[in-house]
């Protein structure tokens, strides 16, 4: 499910107030404000009826994602996985999910854990142990943020791992540092 920031758009009673808010957000987005770009992605991707526009949502998410905005990267990855507003592409989806995970997004970390776990149980994939350790790390990080289902997935995964693999997964999780989003970096 595409996630959102609860209070990004405040509901107002009049349509003119909403249009005014939209114009202000669009002006900021056009100037490169990643928060506003993400907000427009949310607006178009979660709208009802004729206002729903996955192509516009993906376009605005991409603008914010290119500025290392983890939630936009995650939502764009989900859109590529589903083929919403963009061609369905599992490899591109996984790339955006990885960027979101590396940026500290718990949803991205959980979903990357799922992708790594799937690779670890695929008998045709080389590097099953490496994928299992990576899945462990990502589930661990998502669980530490309280992301739904991650703690259970992390615990289930440990049943299939050796002590050495678990120790390595813990070492990697402890060493993880989320990259700072580009739009927040001081140049």
How would you name each of these model-derived features?
Residues 2-12, 148-187:
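Terminal, low-structured helical/coil segments at or just beyond the last alpha-helical repeat
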Residues 2-44:
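N-terminal segments that cap or nucleate solenoid repeat domains
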Residues 13-24, 51-60, 87-96, 123-137, ...:
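Structural signature of tandem alpha-helical TPR/SEL1-like repeats
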Residues 28-29, 36, 41, 57, ...:
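Small-residue (primarily alanine) positions within well-ordered alpha-helices
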Residues 30-33, 46-48, 53, 66-70, ...:
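Short helix-capping/linker turns of helical repeat alpha-solenoids
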Residues 39-46, 73-82, 86, 111-123, ...:
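Hydrophobic face of amphipathic alpha-helices that form TPR/SEL1-like repeat modules
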Residues 43, 64, 79, 100, ...:
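TPR/TPR-like alpha-solenoid repeats
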């Amino acid at each position: 499910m595409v996630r959102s920031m609860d209070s990004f758009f405040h509901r107002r009673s009049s349509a003119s107030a909403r249009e005014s808010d939209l114009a202000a957000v669009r002006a900021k987005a056009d100037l490169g404000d990643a928060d506003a770009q993400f907000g427009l992605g949310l607006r178009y991707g979660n709208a009802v009826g004729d206002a729903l526009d996955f192509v516009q949502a993906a376009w605005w998410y991409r603008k914010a994602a290119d500025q290392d905005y983890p939630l936009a990267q995650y939502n764009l990855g989900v859109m590529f996985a589903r083929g919403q507003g963009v061609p369905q592409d599992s490899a591109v989806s996984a790339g955006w999910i990885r960027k979101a995970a590396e940026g500290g997004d718990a949803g991205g970390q959980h979903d990357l854990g799922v992708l790594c776990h799937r690779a670890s149980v695929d008998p045709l994939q080389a590097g099953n142990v490496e994928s299992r350790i990576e899945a462990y790390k990502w589930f661990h990080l998502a669980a530490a943020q309280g992301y739904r289902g991650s703690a259970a997935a992390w615990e289930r995964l440990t049943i299939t791992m050796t002590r050495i693999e678990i120790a390595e997964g813990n070492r990697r999780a402890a060493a993880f540092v989320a990259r700072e989003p580009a739009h927040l970096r001081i140049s």
